[in-house]
Amino acid sequence: MDTSSINAQSIFDDNAATLKLSWLTGHEGWERGFSADTVANATSSADLVGHLNLIHPNRIQVLGEAEIDYYQRQTDEDRSRHMAELIALEPPFLVVAGGAAAPPELVLRCTRSSTPLFTTPMSAAAVIDSLRLYMSRILAPRATLHGVFLDILGMGVLLTGDSGLGKSELGLELISRGHGLVADDAVDFVRLGPDFVEGRCPPLLQNLLEVRGLGLLDIKTIFGETAVRRKMKLKLIVQLVRRPDGEFQRLPLESQTVDVLGLPISKVTIQVAAGRNLAVLVEAAVRNTILQLRGIDTLRDFMDRQRLAMQDPESQFPGKLV
């Protein structure tokens, strides 16, 4: 991942209002940030932001009341040694939190070394939590997929398939049935947690749906505010295909999944053919997926019922399948 754009200046600009940050000194070091190795070796955003810790120098160092009190109790010699060691390790920047006054020696050393030094009246714990959430979001794995991303019955569903199969027309039909549009054509996905992938629309395409013959439709203007969504968690991928009957599996015995940013996402395949009501089929697929998430597998229940029927000597289906 390119980390060159993640530096003290960008982090300050994005969080100054939320965290009430003030840039005290070290403005010349605005380009300081994280190396690619530091980001690659970090197991989570907790490795990139934390309380003052000289063992982990390559992270954002936050000094709260406890750290400042500890500093004040040290001898002049120990203070000088600790400050020199901290600055020599070249952290991206330092934050003095809790409204505490930054120690004069720390301010002087940050000025001389061009180390950015921020202050904030907010507590150290609040600053760390907020910066960790921010770092986890901007450093999360990302991907852009082609398709129509919708909110169907509260579930994020991505319609995919070759061009010309009618994905946008199907999306328009589903929107007219009360479902919501997240994005059309290009969908930005980001893995924000260990068990979910979130999809959003690029700002340029916000609220727009392209339909052949009609051009660009502003879904928010046509259908109202409730017809669009800002983001949704991806739970199901519906792939539209056009195949001969002999190549289409009517009853897949195993659940199908697609890997999206390292997370398996449920997938169903729907054949496009004349006379098929695709909107109803997609809604049924979503309802069935919801049941599966609740532990209800209709196909497996049927197979168990069939097996018991064949084992029953009084059953009207004696014998076994061949």
UniProtKB/Swiss-Prot annotation:
| Cofactor dependency | Mg(2+)
Primary enzyme class: transferase
Keywords recorded for this protein, A-Z: ATP-binding, Kinase, Magnesium, Metal-binding, Multifunctional enzyme, Nucleotide-binding, Serine/threonine-protein kinase, Transferase
**What EC identifiers does the entry list?**
2.7.11.-, 2.7.4.-
* One Gene Ontology term from the biological process aspect of the record: regulation of carbohydrate metabolic process
- Where is the stretch described as Important for the catalytic mechanism of dephosphorylation? 271-276
Q: Which GO terms describe its molecular function?
A: ATP binding; magnesium ion binding; phosphorelay sensor kinase activity; protein serine/threonine kinase activity; protein serine/threonine/tyrosine kinase activity
Annotated region Important for the catalytic mechanism of both phosphorylation and dephosphorylation: the residues are: 209-218
Question: Can you tell me which residues bind ATP?
Answer: G161, D162, S163, G164, L165, G166, K167, S168
Residues recorded as binding Mg(2+), renumbered to this chain, are S168, E210
Q: What domain of life? A: Bacteria
Catalytic function, reaction form:
[HPr protein]-L-serine + ATP = [HPr protein]-O-phospho-L-serine + ADP + H(+); [HPr protein]-O-phospho-L-serine + phosphate + H(+) = [HPr protein]-L-serine + diphosphate
Q: Which CDD domains match?
A: HprK_C
* Catalytic residues, chain numbering: H146, K167, D185, R250
Give a short account of what the protein does. Catalyzes the ATP- as well as the pyrophosphate-dependent phosphorylation of a specific serine residue in HPr, a phosphocarrier protein of the phosphoenolpyruvate-dependent sugar phosphotransferase system (PTS). HprK/P also catalyzes the pyrophosphate-producing, inorganic phosphate-dependent dephosphorylation (phosphorolysis) of seryl-phosphorylated HPr (P-Ser-HPr).
Record's comment describing the protein's domains: The Walker A ATP-binding motif also binds Pi and PPi.
Concerning PANTHER family, the annotation shows: HPR KINASE_PHOSPHORYLASE, PROTEIN YJDM-RELATED
So what family is this one in? Answer: Belongs to the HPrK/P family.
The miscellaneous annotation reads: Both phosphorylation and phosphorolysis are carried out by the same active site and suggest a common mechanism for both reactions.
Please name the NCBIfam families in this protein's record: hpr-ser
Provide the assembly information: Homohexamer.
Q: What is this protein called?
A: HPr kinase/phosphorylase
| Gene transcribed to yield this protein | hprK
